[in-house]
Structure formats: C-alpha cells, structure tokens
Amino acid sequence: MISYRNEVILSGTLAKKFEYQQGYDQVRKKSEAILEVRRKSGRKDQVIIQASGWKTEVAEKLQEGDYVYVKGEIRMYGYIGEDGEKHTKIYVHIDRIWKDVAAEQDSNEVKLVGAIVKKAALRKLPKAQKIQGITVATKCCSQSANAYIPVVAQGRMASRVCENYDVRYEIRITGRYQSRNYKKKYPNGKKEEKTTYEVSITKLDI
C-alpha cells in the first residue's frame, strides 16, 4: 500500500495580492494570489497559491511585493470555462503562510509519493534535450480526494524514467514546482498563450 505524500515549501514575492474567489465552492471562503519564485538561473516562476477558511484573514492582510513563505500541498479542480470547455486548475493550497525578510535564494521544494497513472512519449527538444512527462496520482493530506499532478523529467533523468518506470509504479519524487508557458492551437488555426503548472524532478526513487 502506498504511503502517499504531497508537500510543497515555497518562498518568494507576492506578484498579486490575495483576492476573494467565488463560484466553485460555496461552503468555505477562498482567496488566491500569485507568488513569484526565483530559480537559481534567475528565471521566475509565477504560481497560484490559495488560502481557505480562517487562513484567508491572515492572507488578505499581505500586500503585493511582500516576501512570504508558504507550506502546503498541490491541489487541482475541474470546472467549465466561459468557452464551455472543461478545464483543470492546479494550485498550491496553503497550510501555513508567513511574511519574512527576502532570502538570497527563494525556496522551492516538492516532496511527492504516489503512483504513475499516465506516461507520455519521450520527447526530444533542440540541442538533443530529452523530456519525459508523467502524471502522478497522490492524496491531498487534508482531503480524501486524489490529486493528479503533472511531472516532468529532463535530460538523463528523462531517459531513466522512460526506461525504468511504467504506469502503476509507485514513485518518490523530490523536485521543483514550476510554471511553463505554451501556445495552444485550436482547430480553427487560432493560437492562444496559456500557462501550465508542473513538478520538475530533481531526485526520484521507487
């Protein structure tokens, strides 16, 4: 039996302060913000963080530009968009959040234990860079629902996942939570820039 794990620790600057959200959950108050997290390379990830219940009172006192630490878990929910299509929203649900002085290097660590439920084909990018995508099913610690988390491996790690890990395998991941922009092409030829969120593997075990 899998001992599921789903933990995220982030620190960074609030690029957009917390705002009340409504529409998909009428039971508990929810508030969302955008957290900007710097990589060692200097590139910045902008990720959605969400507070619920009494934590919204703490979160909504924070201002844009504040440096904060967040501890939580990755969650997702499905909804019907204005286009009438089904969409999935991936975000970090906050268990703890606190304001602090800016660190020299932002924190970004994910710990996941779950099962592989989907495995994409190994892709090769320019300069022979390899990318392997998988979907990992894990649990939300404070909910009974599953979370199906997009995960990517790059370079030699991608080859390792491709050759040694298959659907239904239990996998233990240490990684980084990141945002990635891409262009979606529709049947009518129209292209739209969108953002997806995923875990990039830095270490894995079975």
Where do the model's predicted regions map?
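Single-stranded nucleic acid-binding surfaces, predominantly the OB-fold ssDNA-binding core
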Residues: 1-206
